[in-house]
Amino acid sequence: MAEVIEHLAISEDHFLETITGKVMKAPPRPKGEDEDVKKIDEFVIANVPDRTSKFKAPEPIAPKNRFGSPEASLKHFLESRERSIAFLKKTEGLRDHALESPFKNKFDAYQWVLFMTAHSERHTKQINEVKADAKFSKA
């Protein structure tokens, strides 16, 4: 479970850096791809949290005990989430720019935010699965 929490903390930073440093600076989505926006939104919301497919974390966001403890990882995640929320509160035009995603579609910044939150939901489900396992030590 500690590795999942660390992965979430690293991922939150990675998503925000991608959105602010790349997506918001990318060109607009090409004409003709606008009709795909709703389909992509729905795809992200339906598929990213789905735990029936398993994936290995890419190397840059793989857990490596960067924070020293699960508590420190959680603290970092919460601080990163606050930065994400602050960015969203002050930023307009999330649909105005699009960048290639891991799914081979271009995601606009709004869709990257959907991806970030759906990714958190996926791993929250994973944590709950671990906690529900009879072998999980509650001590």
Give the residues covered by each predicted segment.
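Short, contiguous alpha-helical
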Residues: 1-43, 89, 93-139
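Acidic/histidine-rich alpha-helical segments that form the ligand environment
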Residues: 40-95
